[in-house]
């Protein structure tokens, strides 16, 4: 049902901080089903060739840092920890094993590009972002490109690990100001507090909240989405967010508008074990 709603490659995905860390990105099923094209931004030169090989024709790799358009210092750390912000030694020392992971190996001067200024990037439908503390900077400088975006998935920190890093609350306020509401946590990461080890293993999580991948969606409660936005939100909800109830809401609305046959809506609901 959902695949028939969209032309091949219709969903425009932006992945900011696209380094491959051993896990498939949340939009992988959209690519596998021919529904999306990803613009992958990654300033770490160690990752660029791998990204190009993995994405092939389904992606465009842009080896640049996204930010506020100003010149910054890229702090190159272990994979997954590199950031435009400097790691905070006090925060790292609070958690077991983080001091080594957040050790800065080298620094590089980089000139960032504002999302709104990137001509080769079309308006974004689905933004995935993992930029180690620079999320708010990117969002504030990408309001035009995100004007019709329907889903944003980003990593946000409950405890900040970088100097000057905005906490979860500041990012949440910006997302709401741009017309999004929280939809779900894809995961919530906890970690053990140093120096005590649980079972002697630093990888065993304690109770301290650390960070989470959170999904925001365009506000369906107070806002009106056009047909194209509803189609894309249904596809992203189903294939990337594992949210059949959200996809169903979009399909039912498309049915009310005469865009989708009632039988197609019923077919999806039945397949997902849902009832009206």
Language-model segments: which ranges?
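Phosphate/nucleotide-binding beta-alpha loop and adjacent structural elements of enzyme active sites
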Residues: 1-276
């Amino acid at each position: 049902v959902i695949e028939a709603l969209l032309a091949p490659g219709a969903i425009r995905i932006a992945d900011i901080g696209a380094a491959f860390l051993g896990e498939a990105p949340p939009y992988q099923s959209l690519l596998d089903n021919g529904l999306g094209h990803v613009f992958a931004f990654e300033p770490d030169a160690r990752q660029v060739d791998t990204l190009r090989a993995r994405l092939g024709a389904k992606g465009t790799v842009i080896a640049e840092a996204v930010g506020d358009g100003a010149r910054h210092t890229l702090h190159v750390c272990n994979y997954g920890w590199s950031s435009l912000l400097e790691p905070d030694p006090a925060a790292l020392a609070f958690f077991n094993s983080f001091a080594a992971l957040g050790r800065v190996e080298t620094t590089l001067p980089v000139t960032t590009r504002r999302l709104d200024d990137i001509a080769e990037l079309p308006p974004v439908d689905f933004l995935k972002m993992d930029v180690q503390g620079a999320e708010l900077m990117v969002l504030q400088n990408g309001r035009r490109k995100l004007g019709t975006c329907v889903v944003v998935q980003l990593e946000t920190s409950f405890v900040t690990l970088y100097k000057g890093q905005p906490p979860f609350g500041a990012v949440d306020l910006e997302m709401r100001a741009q017309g999004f509401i929280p939809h779900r946590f894809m995961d919530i990461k906890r970690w053990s507090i140093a120096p005590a080890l649980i079972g002697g293993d630093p990888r065993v999580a304690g109770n301290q909240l650390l960070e989470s991948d959170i999904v925001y969606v365009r506000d369906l409660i107070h806002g009106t989405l056009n047909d194209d936005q509803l189609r894309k939100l249904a596809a992203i909800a189903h294939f990337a967010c594992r949210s059949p109830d959200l996809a169903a809401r979009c399909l039912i609305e498309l049915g009310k508008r005469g865009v989708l046959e009632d039988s197609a809506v019923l077919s999806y609901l039945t397949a997902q074990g849902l009832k009206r």
